[in-house]
Amino acid sequence: MGYYSLTEVTAVQYAKEHGYFEKKANVVCHEIGDGNLNYVFKLDDGEKSIIIKQALPYAKVVGESWPLSIKRATIESKALQIFAKYVPEYVPVVYSHDEELAVTVIEDLSRLTITRKGLIDGEEYPLLSQHIGRFLANVLFYTSDFGLQSEEKRVLEGTFVNPDLCKITEDLVFTDPFGHYDTNDYEPELQLTIDELWSDKTLKLKVAQYKYKFLTRKEALIHGDLHTGSIFSSPSETKVIDPEFATYGPFGFDIGQFIANLLLNALSREEEQRGVLFFHIEKTWSYFVETFTKLWIGEGVEAYTKEKQWLPIILQNIFTDTVGFAGCELIRRTIGLAHVADLDEITNKETRIQAKKQALSLGKELIKYESKNADIQLFRTLFQQTVSGGIKA
C-alpha cells in the first residue's frame, strides 16, 4: 500500500490491526503532537494506552515546500533502542517500528510532564540533572571509541547517517542565526542587537569552528536535539524522547544543548528563582564526569584509556565544546526558526525583549570564551555578569 499519513481514525485501525487493542475495543484517539516534524497520536481504551508517532515527509513547521526523508523515523527508533541498551530507565519502551509507514509505537508517558512546561510552571525535578548526566555519560561513552571496539563503532556510525536532519542543525543552529536568512524570526526591538551580533567577525569565526566540529567530529552517538522539550519528567522519573536528529557527532553537543535550555529558563525567572537551574547545570556536569570516569576506568576498551593523563584532557575538550555549543543554542533559540516558550511566553513585552537581549549576549560570550582552566561555574559567572549589565550585546 505504501506510505500514507495517519489520521485519528486510521491510527486506531492501525493499532487494532497490529494487535495493540481488541477489534471491538472502544479506543479513544487524539493527535497530541506539538512538534515541527511529526504526527503524534495517543490511543487509550480505558485499560491501556499507547503512543503512535509518524514521521511526515515534510517539516510541519514550514509545509510541503520543505521535504524531509521519512527514514528519520527509523533512525529515531534505532536510537531509542541503543539508548535502552545502556540506560533503559531513561527512555520510553519501543513496542514496534514500521519502516514503510514511518510509524513507531511507543510507551505512553502521560504520567509525566514535558520538562520545559514543568519548569515554566515552576515545577521542581530534583533528579533531573542526575538522570540526564548519567544518561549522557552512558550513551556517549558506550557508543564512542572508548567504550566500543573501533570496527563496531564504524558499523554503528553508518547506521546513523542522517543527512536531512543534520542539514537542519547545520543551518538552523550554526548558520542562519548569524546572518541575513529568511528562517530567522525576531522582534524589531532586537534589530540593533542582532546587527552587532552579525557584524562580529570574531564571533563568526568561532561559530564556524563549532559548525566544523559538528560536521566532522564523529565521536559518539548524540541525541542531536536534547532540549527540555525532548524530555519528560516527574519528581522521580526522567525519560528522553524524540531522538530523530540522532547521528554521530561531538561529545559536547547534547550536553551544551541541554545546559543552554536550562539557561533560557533561568533568564525567564526572577533572580531568587534561578538557583535550581544552576543546581541542575552544575550537577548535570558533575554526574556526567563521575559516570564517564567510572566507565572509562572500568569499561574502557581503547588501549590508551589506561593512560591516566588522557581522561582529564578528554573531559576538558568535552567541556570546551559544551560551552560553545550552548552559546550557539542560546542564540538560535532566541532569533532563529524554532523559539522556546521560556522566553516567548514572558507576558510583559519589555521584560521579554530584555531577556532575549540577555540570551544573545550570554550566547555570544559562551561562544567566544577561551580558557583551558574553566569549570562548570563558568555558566553561573557569565550569566550573572550578563544579567547585571557587566556584559552587553
From Swiss-Prot:
The keyword Amino-acid biosynthesis applies. Gene3D superfamilies: 3.90.1200.10, Phosphorylase Kinase, domain 1. It comes from the Bacteria. Substrate binds at residues 225, 332. Keywords: Amino-acid biosynthesis, ATP-binding, Kinase, Methionine biosynthesis, Nucleotide-binding, Transferase. Its EC number is 2.7.1.100. SUPFAM superfamilies: Protein kinase-like (PK-like). NCBIfam families: MTRK (TIGR01767). Belongs to the methylthioribose kinase family. HAMAP family: Salvage_MtnK. This is Methylthioribose kinase. It comes from Bacillus cereus (strain 03BB102).
